[in-house]
Amino acid sequence: LFDEMAYEGHWRETLEFIAHAYKENSSVRSAMEGERNIQGFFTAYLSVNAYYLMAPEMELSHGYCDLFLMPDLMRYEVKHSYILELKYLSVKDTEEKTRTQWQEAVKQINEYAAAPWVRQLVQNTKLHCIIIQFRGWELERMEEV
């Protein structure tokens, strides 16, 4: 799965696999922790990936992106890099909150991608900006923006 992400830019299958694993391994208690729990789970899964240097909560453009997967170009000829923005909704949140949260995430991730030194960190790789929104432990929406 990680080969496809690194060399072909095919990220959906990998991230859906992790989202499914999160659902299968989560409990009501996990939902109480919300976004932090999701971030920890994704960080653990993605950290076993040798193609990238993981940077959770990296400061970019006056904010902190949830996960920045910087290519490890010293060891691999990776073609793609990623910024992941993770969002959590409770099962009781309204559709209006869902839409508002998504719009804010789009604004955030675009600001992160525009940060001056992001280009240096991703070098000549294609940067994918992906928002992953959960409702409880269910994947609500996942898109590249």
Per-range role (PLM):
Residues 3, 7-145:
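Structural signature of nuclease core domains in nucleic-acid processing machines
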